[in-house]
Amino acid sequence: MANSMNGRNPGGRGGNPRKGRILGIIDAIQDAVGPPKQAAADRRTVEKTWKLMDKVVRLCQNPKLQLKNSPPYILDILPDTYQHLRLILSKYDDNQKLAQLSENEYFKIYIDSLMKKSKRAIRLFKEGKERMYEEQSQDRRNLTKLSLIFSHMLAEIKAIFPNGQFQGDNFRITKADAAEFWRKFFGDKTIVPWKVFRQCLHEVHQISSGLEAMALKSTIDLTCNDYISVFEFDIFTRLFQPWGSILRNWNFLAVTHPGYMAFLTYDEVKARLQKYSTKPGSYIFRLSCTRLGQWAIGYVTGDGNILQTIPHNKPLFQALIDGSREGFYLYPDGRSYNPDLTGLCEPTPHDHIKVTQEQYELYCEMGSTFQLCKICAENDKDVKIEPCGHLMCTSCLTAWQESDGQGCPFCRCEIKGTEPIIVDPFDPRDEGSRCCSIIDPFGMPMLDLDDDDDREESLMMNRLANVRKCTDRQNSPVTSPGSSPLAQRRKPQPDPLQIPHLSLPPVPPRLDLIQKGIVRSPCGSPTGSPKSSPCMVRKQDKPLPAPPPPLRDPPPPPPERPPPIPPDNRLSRHIHHVESVPSRDPPMPLEAWCPRDVFGTNQLVGCRLLGEGSPKPGITASSNVNGRHSRVGSDPVLMRKHRRHDLPLEGAKVFSNGHLGSEEYDVPPRLSPPPPVTTLLPSIKCTGPLANSLSEKTRDPVEEDDDEYKIPSSHPVSLNSQPSHCHNVKPPVRSCDNGHCMLNGTHGPSSEKKSNIPDLSIYLKGDVFDSASDPVPLPPARPPTRDNPKHGSSLNRTPSDYDLLIPPLGEDAFDALPPSLPPPPPPARHSLIEHSKPPGSSSRPSSGQDLFLLPSDPFVDLASGQVPLPPARRLPGENVKTNRTSQDYDQLPSCSDGSQAPARPPKPRPRRTAPEIHHRKPHGPEAALENVDAKIAKLMGEGYAFEEVKRALEIAQNNVEVARSILREFAFPPPVSPRLNL
């Protein structure tokens, strides 16, 4: 404690002990009387302070000092302080603002303290004279203490005036209970006198004596100015957490513990431990001067080396206990007595995070659960990062930090602390029949299912099934901090279809996450091998879906298929995962996978049919096939890409081949509840249902690609052995959501969709069907009304969105993508991959990879599936959720066994036009020139229904030939009903 009390007056007026005692008496008087009022900190005062600081710098530049360039380095600290003060003044340049700044209580106290510390340093050189050049002298030690104080002051001014703007009244204290104390006693004040602070603290945590109060002040008052700022209070509460026993912790760790060192630097720790180099296990600990609020522990290793470490995500006493048990921290400051700190280890209450119905439904829709960590997709969230609030599992956070990850894995926000949390799963029984329509990590419904009673009924069974699945998935009640940056926090979208989402985190999502159908978190280090998530592995393996010749028979991957990942490989990987690894969460009914809002009424019926009409095995198969097909759908990256593309759902109509208009893919059906698949498919001629199933299937591949960077990949795992029609039928809309699924490589006309559908079928066959023998129910096709790209974007969500408990901030520009975009937004997706691919491959982008490759996701590497770390928040408006949905749908079909599906939609003709369609944008010049009504009439004259013709034209971008080809391939209900009847 002597060290800590001496630290408050590093100047010490030389090394005279009498003067030190006198100063201690003066300090006691100041504590009783309170500090004097500060004069206004006008520009003149600030400039005077600058001159004093400059003088200190010149004195410290004397070569005789031989200052080491290690923290705290005064020759860096004072110039940085000067620059920040200049920045502050530049923000308050006019007279009115400057007057306001000069009267700011905190700023006045800060400038006064800075001036006094500078004068003390100058006086130190005057009085110390030659002793200043002796590295071991007391005067030199006092200069080092002053350097630490200047370092603390710099950190404080930057925290209170970030970017030069005063934010002291909005400063966020990391620990919630400590923040409540400050708000209760001091409101929005930034700084309070020590005397006032001590009295208020005494009301909550009794201070036994005046001596204890002085020792406490020397610990809290980092800037030694007789005031306690909100910044200093935050640091103190983080160092000696938890708040409930903070003074007891402080007494054990700072007052009585022999290993505590106040105002010690890195070099001084090494010098102090040098004498114990022959005694391994010797250790001391200090406040980190570079990371205020954290501890730095120096210790002697078994081979006599001296190391220093900063423990993460645990209180100091826990770190010391663990280190003692492991044989690292045995002798505090070389002493044989090591205090027993186990008494401080009291079970701390965990924050309980309640999963909302919307979140529950959204994650059920994705085939995942809210409590599942979105980084590893293996463990449940059990830690919350402060102050951003993102949630994850401890193992992922630890891995991230051990790999030198900086800040929050999702938003890169500074990690000031962590809190253990427990997720209270949503109990659908408490919410009536609405079990899981769609889960929005931010509590925002992905789709407005309540608007349509029919939709409600059709989704009822799906919700119930999803609830059970979600319950199974929920491995642990613990959840992690919620995001976005974030900035990452998702933003609500104006459309019910639109869903708020967070920007993708900088770290590429893991395949494991995709596999689990969970939003990928940006943690680089936590991202483990995709082995944990078979679906994710699939995504990586799966190339862009190649257009298979017939839906029933797995078509060979056409040239259109992206070369980077052979569909067969992807398929096989997916299949392998599906078979070998059951989905973490119970498979979701196709209904759940097909958002009602996104799908047309008929499409919804298709979804319902898939979920209800088709035997449970089929539904389960679809979800199981993916192993986490719903998870794939949940992939935020995929959804993002879709949002970016903002493909209109209508444009991405669902066809018998299973392809949906890009818009349809982007947005899950929100129409009336899907009727039985068999019924819907026939009524829609399987166009809607098949397309929906295809889109869902496509989404599955996309989610796998997401592993690369949560990039939806429409690469079908070409399951040649499996019929593709069911897959096509099942999630076409979802594929749209993935971006690639929307057109599955044929973002353009129906021909492209056809090829994509075959690919999807292949993927379903090979991957889904192989993994799950049960046929996959076909989701209903989405109605063209959904062609608005914004719908798709609204469905897209980022991993951060799901991870964050934070409510949606607002719509993103991407989320609100204009619904006016042509239904074939998939071209946007194809624009990334298609342009580089041959026409066939372009028409069939690596379902989701292409979309992700769109400029919005330039960072995605289609071939590798890896994506460079984007900024913590990428595109808030990215169609992440839509991608998820499509992936989910895609995976659902994949889960179903193609073999079980007795009948498949007619094989789609080769997509000879697919590449063109992909490259061609939905709003191409040809579409604009041709008379849409005449085209509709012409095709209707050939016996096709108006809705089918309209969807086909939207998908084909008003290209009659392509639309005719689409109708020919998908307009008539494929023989998928047997599969649905699994």
From Swiss-Prot:
**Keyword Zinc included in the entry's annotation:** yes
Q: Which GO terms describe its cellular component?
A: cytosol; glutamatergic synapse; membrane raft; nucleoplasm; plasma membrane; postsynapse
For the region Interaction with VAV1, give the residue spans: 543-568
Predominant location: cytoplasm
Question: Known post-translational modifications?
Answer: Phosphorylated on tyrosine and serine residues upon TCR or BCR activation, and upon various types of cell stimulation.
**Residue spans of biased composition, Basic residues class:** 906-922
Instruction: List compositional bias (Polar residues) regions by residue number.
Output: 473-486, 715-725, 880-899
EC numbers for this chain: 2.3.2.27
Q: Which residues are annotated as modified residue Phosphoserine in the UniProt record?
A: 282, 476, 480, 484, 521, 525, 529, 634
Q: What induces it?
A: By serum starvation.
Q: Where is this region: SH2-like?
A: 241-343
Q: Where is this region: Interaction with SH3KBP1?
A: 891-927
Q: Which SUPFAM superfamilies match?
A: EF-hand, N-terminal domain of cbl (N-cbl), RING/U-box, SH2 domain
List residues binding Ca(2+): 221, 223, 225, 227, 232
Q: What else is known?
A: This protein has one functional calcium-binding site.
The protein depicted here goes by the name E3 ubiquitin-protein ligase CBL-B
Lineage, highest ranks first: Eukaryota, Metazoa, Chordata, Craniata, Vertebrata
